[in-house]
């Protein structure tokens, strides 16, 4: 190989290396943020926040959708996304305790009340002894559902159980109801199961089959519920400017109006 050819080859190799370095994922776009949300009505609400963030703050929001409550925190912890907006504080606290996540709330969003739904009965007076009642199986929403059942007199829980009771804390069950724990996304479908008389469903999943607490719920969680949903970041990015911009965009009148529309009046402002 001639000296001249060697020089040309070396220069070409250097240019190629520089090109690869320049195009590599070494830095995130300065005005870009990835936000995890649950598919369905919450996604529709987040899409309005996405628009507000762009128009008011010049922030490009990429929405990443999930079908369950477990993966959004895992993705956030790994750095696959920058924020998520889907969970209430008791759930976040339990996830941090169980999985050691270094996650933190950076703002409130909405309270989405849970409610009791049925395709078999029209009132609780029709609920027969021994009926099966479907509940979400994750610890915080299970506890939330048991507290709701207690509030309407279907069960009684031990004193002092706090926000995380389990079925083992049921001390009175006058109708001998069979409490069946299911994955939250399965609860809407459980209404078609002939064995299930009643299901306690989060508004996020109920809305996916056209149900709303005010119109379709046999009984509904009180609006003073402590289960306000949160916008969550990692401890290492909680103070980032893009995070603050997204929170401001989400806590806007436009997003509140969108939430009320998406949930047919079932969203309560949490800020």
UniProtKB/Swiss-Prot annotation:
Lipid anchor positions (N-palmitoyl cysteine): 23
Membrane association type: Lipid-anchor
GO annotation, cellular component aspect: plasma membrane
S-diacylglycerol cysteine lipid modification positions: 23
Domain of life: Bacteria
UniProt GO BP: D-methionine transmembrane transport; methionine import across plasma membrane
This protein's record includes keyword Cell membrane: yes
Membrane-crossing residue ranges in chain numbering: none
Described purpose of this protein according to its UniProt entry: This protein is a component of a D-methionine permease, a binding protein-dependent, ATP-driven transport system.
Recorded family membership: Belongs to the NlpA lipoprotein family.
Protein name: D-methionine-binding lipoprotein MetQ
Lineage: Bacteria, Pseudomonadati, Pseudomonadota, Gammaproteobacteria, Enterobacterales
Gene: metQ
């Amino acid at each position: 190989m001639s000296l001249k050819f060697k020089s040309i080859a070396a220069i070409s190799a250097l240019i190629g290396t520089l090109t690869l370095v320049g195009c590599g994922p070494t830095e995130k776009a300065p005005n870009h943020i990835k936000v995890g949300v649950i598919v369905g009505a919450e996604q529709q609400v987040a899409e309005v926040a996405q628009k507000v963030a762009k128009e008011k703050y010049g922030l490009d929001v990429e929405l990443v959708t999930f079908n369950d409550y477990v993966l959004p925190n895992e993705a956030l912890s790994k750095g696959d996304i920058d924020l998520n907006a889907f969970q209430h504080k008791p759930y976040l606290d339990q996830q941090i305790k169980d999985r050691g996540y270094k996650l933190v709330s950076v703002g409130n969003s909405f309270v989405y009340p849970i409610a009791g739904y049925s395709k078999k009965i029209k009132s609780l007076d029709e609920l027969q002894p021994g009926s099966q009642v479907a509940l979400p199986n994750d610890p915080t929403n299970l506890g939330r559902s048991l507290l709701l059942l207690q509030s309407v007199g279907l069960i009684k829980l031990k004193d002092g159980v706090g926000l995380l009771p389990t079925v083992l804390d049921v001390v009175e069950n006058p109708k001998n109801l069979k409490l069946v724990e299911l994955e939250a996304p399965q609860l809407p479908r459980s209404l078609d199961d002939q064995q299930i008389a009643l299901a306690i469903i989060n508004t996020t999943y109920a809305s996916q089959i056209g149900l709303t607490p005010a119109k379709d719920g046999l009984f509904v969680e009180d609006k003073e519920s402590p289960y306000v949903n949160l916008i969550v970041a990692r401890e290492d990015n909680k103070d980032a400017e893009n995070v603050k911009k997204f929170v401001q965009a989400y806590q806007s009148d436009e997003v509140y109006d969108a939430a009320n529309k998406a949930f047919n009046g079932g969203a309560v402002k949490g800020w």
